[in-house]
Curated annotation (Swiss-Prot):
Xref: PROSITE patterns: GLOBIN
A GO molecular function held by the record: heme binding
A single GO cellular-component term on record: extracellular region
Keywords (A to Z) from UniProt: Heme, Iron, Metal-binding, Oxygen transport, Signal, Transport
UniProt keyword annotation of Iron present: yes
Taxonomic path: Eukaryota, Metazoa, Ecdysozoa, Arthropoda, Hexapoda
Amino-acid positions noted as binding heme b in the UniProt annotation, renumbered to this chain: H75, H110
A Pfam match: Globin
Family per record: Belongs to the globin family.
Annotated signal sequence range: 1-15
InterPro entries assigned: Erythrocruorin (IPR002336), Globin (IPR000971), Globin-like_sf (IPR009050), Globin/Proto (IPR012292), Mb-like_M (IPR044399)
Protein name: Globin CTT-II beta
The organism of origin for this protein: Chironomus thummi thummi (Midge)
Segments forming domain Globin: 17-160
Length: 160
């Protein structure tokens, strides 16, 4: 029975995969910001201090001071690198097993640390807000990001 529920969750997550055109929109917009790793993480932490507090190496520290450290840049690179891997795999159904492996591993890591779904949703909202402030945002791009993130987060939530 558990397998059936899991299979249904995964099927729902990929029920509307991105088309090649939608994936191209997502990749194009991501290419404009993906080298701003520190700025992206700073933006997310500034908007969500509760997320920053979940990282022992950053908890209780001044964000403005942290922003200029190598430790912050390294962690920002890991987070943005993960998003970059997922974005690169979108839009091609042959890439679904690779996406699922990445997402499953990330979900397991965060589940073990007790990260709630609400914080993932905060992260998502802040990431989208950052994108909207940095790229030429329109309805088509917004719809593509929404669908892509829905797919990723639905799959991730099935593993939390």
């Amino acid at each position: 029975m558990k397998f059936l529920v899991l299979a249904l969750c995964i099927a729902a997550a990929v029920a509307a995969p991105l088309s090649a055109d939608e994936a191209s929109l997502v990749r194009g917009s991501w290419a404009q910001v993906k080298h701003s790793e520190v700025d992206i993480l700073y933006y997310i932490f500034k908007a969500n201090p509760d997320i920053m507090a979940k990282f022992p190496q950053f908890a209780g520290k001044d964000l403005e001071t942290l922003k200029g450290t190598g430790q912050f840049a390294t962690h920002a690179g890991r987070i943005v690198g993960f998003v970059s891997e997922i974005v690169a795999l979108m839009g091609n159904s042959a890439n679904m097993p690779a996406m699922e492996t990445l997402i499953k591993d990330m979900a397991a890591n965060h589940k073990a640390r007790g990260i709630p779904k609400a914080q993932f949703n905060e992260f998502r909202a802040s990431l989208v807000s950052y994108l909207q402030s940095k790229v030429s945002w329109n309805d088509s791009l917004g719809a593509a990001w929404t669908q892509g993130l829905d797919n990723v987060f639905n799959m991730m939530f099935s593993y939390l």
